[in-house]
Regions:
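Feature captures the catalytic ectodomains and active-site-proximal regions of enzymes
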Residues: 1-183
Length: 183
């Protein structure tokens, strides 16, 4: 059902419902899937950019299309990047003087969690950790390492669990934490 009664909303809802119905009919006898879940129907939201709100010149370094799109919505310049993790940090280093805020997204931690692949999730976190010294050499005011949600391997799904949060800054007071953990 459309969320509003505008002609545009009714037309979109009708089209989407027709597409879902056709796909469901086509998949009717398939053993692995019987329908499709479509999401993300909306207009580009009008929200203030990071430049307007915080006077930043932000850049996003991400491969996954959803995160690239979200970055654009909040006014970040989305930088081209290769497919390897090292590419993320190479771009950060080469573009560091051109921006004053960077969002660097490592997708595989989430993907391995959804696959239930603990060994590879651990490896990708450890591999990411090895790039921290490269970031520190750039001498940023702040480094934050966290996740947008938890994806425990045991659940193979996003969850309500807390995210570890690491903040390093010469302007922040240290705490007593000695490890980066969800506990």
């Amino acid at each position: 059902e459309p969320l509003s009664q505008s002609e545009e909303a009714r037309k979109t809802a009708s089209t989407v419902n027709h597409i879902i119905s056709r796909i469901t009919d086509i998949l009717d006898d398939q053993p692995k899937a019987n329908t499709v879940l479509l999401r993300g129907f909306s207009k580009h939201p009008t929200i203030p950019s990071m430049q307007e709100l915080f006077k930043l010149n932000p850049a996003a370094i991400a491969n996954y299309p959803m995160y690239r799109g979200l970055a654009k919505i909040v006014g970040m310049t989305v930088l081209d990047v290769g497919t390897e993790m090292e590419d993320l940090f190479d771009v950060l280093e080469t573009q560091y003087q051109n921006y004053n805020f960077f969002y660097v997204h490592v997708k595989k931690t989430d993907s391995y969690g959804e696959d239930g692949n603990y060994a590879d999730k651990k490896k990708i976190i450890e591999a990411t950790d090895k790039f921290i010294p490269r970031i520190q050499k750039l001498n940023p005011d702040v480094i934050v390492v966290t996740g947008d949600h938890s994806t425990p391997c045991v659940l193979k799904s996003h969850s309500w669990h807390p995210n570890p949060f690491l903040l390093v800054s010469r302007y922040a007071l240290p705490d007593k934490a000695v490890r980066f953990s969800e506990r």
